[in-house]
Amino acid sequence: MSRFLLALAFVFSLAAPASAQASPMLATGSSADSLLVSGKQMLGENGGSLDAMYAAKAAFERTLADTGVAAWGHYYMALADYRIADYLLAAGEENKGAASEHLKATVEHLQKATEINPQAAEAYVLLSSAYGRQIGLNPIKGMVLGRRAQKALKKAAQLAPDNPRVVLCTAIRDFNTPGMFGGSKEKGLQGFQRAAELFAQEEPTNPIHPVWGHSRTYAWLGIAYQDRGELELARAAFKKALAINPSFGWVKYVLLPELEKASSLDAP
């Protein structure tokens, strides 16, 4: 189970809060809208600098007084805290304590977002991931936080079964969860394929709403194909991920090199 939670957490690491499609969060107001869009730009495609992430968080905080966008404000403050935590952890184990505090803030903001708008599927997806990230830092809390993570993802799926991010994260869970606990590699693969179809249909309608996840869907699709020994399909999926996001370091520097190494070992 912890393997699923850690994998689910990773999918949100450095996720790009780009322009967006409609989502069931609250309606927005013009002044706060501008702050949210500006903050998203500061976060950047791959998290940007630590200063940029803190600046984005400050912009999001200024939107909280606007009841029309408060749910979005809390959502993006949570996303900023989540990505700051990832940045700190990548910089070294000595930052574990500070990262833990940012993940705590992530959960608190997402809980507020769902209190303001109980239909906020995007917030429930990120909340599930945040719980998983907390388990990675403190496995002793796995039993309690694991149930919360599963509950949050289930709620997201109930609210927005065709949301591509919900479908992607559900597929990651299915792919990484052992069969004795209800997981299935085949079910996971089918989920990745469905998520790819849904992302292809996603059309931006509001610059506030999240649309991250398209390139990551192909990264996971490639992983699933490689697990089945279908290396050419895996390579095509990884290349598709890079076509969508050329700076996708996970694919460029980890997944593709691992695939090429596996291919050379299989060569006659």
Residues of each region from the PLM?
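Positively charged n-region of N-terminal signal peptides that target proteins for export
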Residues: M1-F4, A20
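Bacterial N-terminal signal peptides
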Residues: L5-P17
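Boundary at the C-terminal end of the N-terminal hydrophobic targeting segment
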Residues: A18-A22, A27
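Short coil/linker segments at helix-helix boundaries
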Residues: V37-A58, A80-T114, Q119, A123-K155, ...
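Canonical tetratricopeptide repeat
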Residues: Y76, L126, C169, W220, ...
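Terminal, low-structured helical/coil segments at or just beyond the last alpha-helical repeat
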Residues: Q201-P268
